[in-house]
Amino acid sequence: SVTKYTDNTANGGGSTASYVTATTDYFFLLSEFEVFGSITYGNTNEKNKQAQYAYYSAGNSKIKYKHNGTSTAALWWLRSPIASTCATFVFVDTAGTVNINIANYSLGFAPGFCV
């Protein structure tokens, strides 16, 4: 298992350090900071408990492709909620840049896991 820190409690309450709490996971979505190395939309305090994955800090592409159309880029969810709004989360768009959307949209995901 791995301990992941995320704003799990704010519900749109803003960037407050106490809102960033731990979960123990085996299978998880990546956070905005773990992918981009910066925070544009999420709780800025998440970065104090996270690190950017070496794969992304090395400059590798953040673009993911659909399983049923491998030349078609896909939108994919991250686990970071928007600090200022409830029910809205960060995702990666088809250009590989950070974006936001309401959580009831069906987007892809590129999970991490721990064995």
Model-identified regions with their sequence ranges:
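Collagenous Gly-X-Y triple-helix signature in extracellular proteins
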Residues: 1-115
